[in-house]
Amino acid sequence: MEDLQLVLFVLGAIAIVAVLVHGFWSIRKQQPRTIKEQPRTPYAMSPGRRDAEGFDADGIGEVRVRKLAPDDKKSEPVKASHDDTFSLSDEPKVRRVKERQEPVLESRADAAPNHAAHERRGHDFRHHEEPSPSARQVQLGLLDDLDQEPSQGELYEEINASVADYDDDYDAYENQPASVDRAEAARVPADQGQAAHSAATQAEPQAKAEEPLPDPRDVLVLHVVAREGQVLAGAELLPCLLELNFKYGDMEIFHRHEDNAGNGKVLFSLANMLKPGTFDPDTMEQFNTHGIVLFMTLPCHGEAVMNFSLMLNSACQLADDLDALVLDGQRQLWSDATKAQYLARIRANA
């Protein structure tokens, strides 16, 4: 009996060992090959990534390994040697630089006209023209007269008195002969002819320099004043001036130039009606005044009638935007009779 148990124990042990061996063999068979046993083929070198000629998408071919022949010898390093001999073949190749041609200097007699022409061209592109000494004196004199500005109460008393006399002045204006209207109507074709002539002159390749203006003989003045009990606020005044193409410039006041961008000659100017008559754009938000004054000297650049019309339209536009009144140079209400007087003064100084 004991022999039978021993035999069964041995057979069971052999069966267990056989099962274990078979299990390890099955696991080893199903396990993939290790990395060392697998061929290392890069992703770019796979057959699916290359064309028929062996080039990949970037145009790079397969890497070729060249075996070193047994008789190949390593290249010996070049030994530095000092040689005092010099040959033309040893010269480094120098890139030829094209010689710069120096400008030929002109004589003083020939360069003077060209220098004057350059000064004229540069003068045309200046944003702010320096006024002539005589015109500057007129502007300074006008600003000095601001010291004698009446108080607001006296100003409105003059306005009320002018309203009472307005009807009489208007009747007298209507009774005037029609010669003024005929002369103004006859002047329109002449103005158009002069405008066409000026345009043709600008089209010429070499335009003559403008002649300097003579000394001012007259000054046309317009006032824009606030209504009684009100003031003109700088926060509202500055946008209106910029919209009307006024540019802040010389003498710390605003100017209207020939070009809307602020280029060219000054046509007329705008100053504060109260002392000292200047503006400060940095403090316009806190600025208040009872009125402003627009003035134009005669003779002026361009057409005086057109310049005056532009100044009058600017004054009326400011009065409409700021709810103000337009007065003449004598601080009277603006009327058609006053306009006729101003036109007569323009024709007298033409």
Curated annotation (Swiss-Prot):
Q: Which InterPro entries match?
A: Cell_div_ZipA, ZipA_FtsZ-bd_C, ZipA_FtsZ-bd_C_sf
Q: Which Cys pairs are S-S linked?
A: none
Similarity field: Belongs to the ZipA family.
What PANTHER family does the annotation carry?
Answer: CELL DIVISION PROTEIN ZIPA (PTHR38685:SF1)
Q: Which UniProt keywords apply?
A: Cell cycle, Cell division, Cell inner membrane, Cell membrane, Membrane, Transmembrane, Transmembrane helix
Q: Where in the cell is it found?
A: Cell inner membrane
Q: Which residues lie on this side of the membrane: Periplasmic?
A: 1-6
Function according to Swiss-Prot or TrEMBL: Essential cell division protein that stabilizes the FtsZ protofilaments by cross-linking them and that serves as a cytoplasmic membrane anchor for the Z ring. Also required for the recruitment to the septal ring of downstream cell division proteins.
What Gene3D superfamilies does the record point to?
ZipA, C-terminal FtsZ-binding domain (3.30.1400.10)
Gene Ontology annotations for the cellular component aspect, listed alphabetically: cell division site; plasma membrane
Question: Which SUPFAM superfamilies does this entry report, sorted A to Z?
Answer: Cell-division protein ZipA, C-terminal domain
For this protein, the parts annotated as crossing the membrane are 7-27
Which lineage do the record's taxonomy fields give for this organism?
Answer: Bacteria, Pseudomonadati, Pseudomonadota, Gammaproteobacteria, Alteromonadales
Q: Which organism is it from?
A: Shewanella amazonensis (strain ATCC BAA-1098 / SB2B)
Taken from the record's topology, the Cytoplasmic segments are 28-350
**Cell inner membrane listed as a keyword:** yes
Q: What is this protein called?
A: Cell division protein ZipA
Bias (Basic and acidic residues) occurs at 65-109, 116-131
- Region Disordered: which residues? 36-55, 65-136, 187-213
Membrane topology field: Single-pass type I membrane protein
**Where is it predominantly found?**
membrane
**A biological-process GO annotation:** FtsZ-dependent cytokinesis
Q: How does this chain assemble?
A: Interacts with FtsZ via their C-terminal domains.
Which SMART domains does this UniProt record tie to the protein? Answer: ZipA_C
